[in-house]
């Protein structure tokens, strides 16, 4: 069972380190731990409120545990991972955007899949939908008449999101509290600001929240 380096003596039930919606194939070197908070009952309750789930796939590489050692984080080389975004997911994103709803990613792996599937050169599928991609963002891909999420079959990504990066698809994120100097910390600091993330972590420490894989989660809006 693939475990992060800070878990060296786990003797619990392997099923406790697996999401309820995981595929049976063994491709990933780590579990998408934000999803460990979800049970079938919780997902049913969320859907009863009107939310819809759509599944993406990303084969997490072992380098997900590798910390950013460079003094200049822009020099860090991101590992390559394989991912899949189906037509069903693309349609779900379009529907959510068209109806004015948020696309909420569960975990950083879902973020990397969805944002990797955004093609800045793709023709606009629906101006009303694509305009939502850049709402409140500086680059505004839709103003050029292009930019859309597209189907990705068996694709690869080295997407490295860090402060200053633009999110095109994801509006909000459910994620755990991450290890310092990790690419995951960079990713969440790109969706919020670094100061907001540091404030959230300080509050979590004060309230004695649990960190890392089996820890608590945060919602970034």
Predicted features along the sequence, with ranges:
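Surface-exposed, charge/polar-rich loops and edge strands
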Residues: 1-221
